[in-house]
Amino acid sequence: MVKPSHLFYVILLVVTITFSIIGYTPSDVVIVGPSFPQENYFIEELDLISKKTGYKIAYVTLNDVSYYLYNNSKKADLAIITNPSFLYGLSQSEIILPANEYYFESSSEIYSEYLLNLISSYDNSIIYGHWIRLFSNSMIWYNVDRYKELGSPKFNSFDELIEYTESYSTDKDGLWCLSIDSAENQPLLDYEYGESSGWIVSNWLENIVLANYGPEIYDKWIKNEIQFSDSEVILSLLDIGKLIHNEKSIYKGKEYLIRSQVSSSAVNLINEESKCVFSLMGHDANSYMPKNVSYGEDYDFLYFPSTDFTGMVVGIGDTLTLLNYDSSTTRVYQELVSSSFGESWANKINSEFVSARTDFDDSKYSNGFAKKQYKQIQNSLSLNLFRFDGSMLMKNGTGKKILWTSLRKFTTLSNHYLEEIAEEIDTRIKRELEEK
């Protein structure tokens, strides 16, 4: 495992070598961004744009795009940012540039007002980029055959799902396959597990808050106008506790949930040795599934249930930003944010591309999972029920530094400590914000 003190030098070395290679094979447009699944399909899209425009395009992956841009922005032309909360600081430093010129009157119909506000200045007059992909984390995954054996039950709320779980789980046959660890190196010390596992539980919490109380409460919570010790969040945490602190609900029990790789949830959902029916994972569950099974036939997902806010989605996404206004840069930028971007990618049989545009031609999808996810997200946007991952938007990185570690702690304890943990989170966040 790379020590934190050495991490900077590792990143610097990798980036230096990468850009040295680019220096020997000059490109007209250099895009920097994170590494991600199906990156090869993205490169194919870039090749199509290169043939169309005549410009040579390179994509360079970085561990920390924002950090790199603060120190090397002149070495790239475009950047993909996965956290919209980073855009304000980058724009204030004049690293990323306004993209208003590439929006039109009809743009409000292509992108929701909520999404545009996330990547705009505080007064919403300047827009810093375009959304190019979105992903849903509001999915209840299920084993198709086992779900049918239960009679394909429908749920109107997460509470109904919990009640059903309590009625139909037994000591040997928990209905849920759950695991939350995403650390690459095991075993880890307890304190190291926080950030590697708490983010998964935060996804559950965000979904329950949005499903039970709607976007207005969700937004206030993310802005710290509603605290963790307030009833809306306490009751949402309690819903999580009813599931994870009930040993018979979970395949192999809570200790397995805490210590096992998140990918185990997907594997166990299909594994013949288990009898679990459901799993709480986001879009990435599809990539964890064994190669010998298929979406729709062996596994599928339900939309996250809600009584008053049916169609809600908590998700994430990528924003493309401009670093200069060179003619080659702006030409490639326009192609990447056009309605046709991603059509070749969407046509792949295993595609996981989900366009952020409402006018994307969904007939291009040959993959049922990607198409269903696209429709889920677009429906939520039309209802103004799409909200971005809350832990990523919380001020001063408190979502990662405080929420994730505290939620991991909650999974190891019991509902008895619920209020204590909520108050602890509030105290730590208050202290963090005051110090800043």
Give the label of every model feature segment.
Residues 65-79, 147, 163-172, 260-279, ...:
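Short helices/loops that flank or line small-molecule/ion binding pockets
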